Amino acid sequence: MEQCWRWYGPDDPVTLDHVRQAGATGVVSALHHIYDGRAWPEADVLERKRIIEAAGLTWSVVESIPVHNSFKIGAPERERYAGYYRDSIRTLATAGIKTICYNFMPVVDWTRTDLMYRLPTTGYALRFDAVDFAAYDLFVLQRKDGAASYTPARIAEAEKRLKALTSEQVDQIERNLIAGLPATERKYDRDSFREALAEYDGIGPKELRDNLAWFLREIIPVAEEEGVRMCIHPDDPPFSLYGLPRVVSTAQDARFILNAVDSPANGLTFCTGSYGTRADNDIVAMVKEFADRIHFVHLRNITIEEDGSFYEAEHLEGGTDMAHVILALMQEEARRRKEGRADWRIPMRPDHGHLLADDIGKKKINPGYSLIGRLKGLAELRGIMRAVEKFGLA
């Protein structure tokens, strides 16, 4: 597998020298300053590529080209933005960058309530507290019809939790939820967030799924012409938040997506951490089922708690059998090599990492994307890859 590393560009506190020191050879990056649906200018793409290659690395994966909200709500202007998206695909392909990750999550991207969850190891992880989330949704945001999303027991728990939280703790939860985590396209205050949610009135899973299928029909033919592999990232977490539909959460969802436009250009970013947050997702079985359409991999592990909360575990701990995931992926690589595919190598990155050692206390850290935690995770994952190779298992 191609060992990659997410890099947020020149302002990332983790430098490209650090990336090389971690042992990665590929970079996962994007033009994060262009988030409003405009086509990516060729000059900007080439400059980012130049910077990466000057450091002795390869820009292997784009993560992500943002998917404009008009696609998700089915607004008339989506026709115009589809043209911009196709232009960006062509520009990247011309520059030799042919793996493009994207997501179709409405309003909010990846979501956590706690960015500094202290672990027994004394490091820190990212956590989603289901009760804190409900308390915010019901009693701080006061979302219209919010109670319909929860059981009476959860509503009672949430009300009790809110009373136990200080105003500072509530403010911190709100910042974590709506002010924007790394790579999120939009940042909100409470009023603008309510307005964004209102755009989805009347849009349920069927409507969002239909809009995703429309998007795929518009962009996949161009990706196929250009030799580009599009790969959709799952919902994180893979269940409804704020009453919004989410349609990239299960194996059934993945089947719908791949069948909507049956093309090698239409594939998956297989994020073990996102899919793994649902106990009913059999991660190893999903990897095996969708292997030939997995174009990019995020390797991360999750520990799910009884009340539906979860936190990000060590890469080799948690609920996902990471060794068998990697084995299945490397066996797929071997199959592709035998088939003669030029794109046989699957790019992967260690997804998130604990906040550890000298990174603790640094003022400028992208949550989940500190250096040392990801370096540790990549080293552990690399160990499994080497063992698979050494023992001739793939």
From Swiss-Prot:
Its cofactor is Fe(2+); Mn(2+). InterPro entries: Man_deHydtase, Xyl_isomerase-like_sf. It is an enzyme of class 4 (lyase). Pathway: Carbohydrate metabolism; pentose and glucuronate interconversion. Signal peptide: none annotated. It holds the Pfam family UxuA. GO terms for biological process: D-glucuronate catabolic process. Keywords: Iron, Lyase, Manganese. Its EC number is 4.2.1.8. It catalyses: D-mannonate = 2-dehydro-3-deoxy-D-gluconate + H2O. GO terms for molecular function: ferrous iron binding; manganese ion binding; mannonate dehydratase activity. Catalyzes the dehydration of D-mannonate. Belongs to the mannonate dehydratase family. This is Mannonate dehydratase.
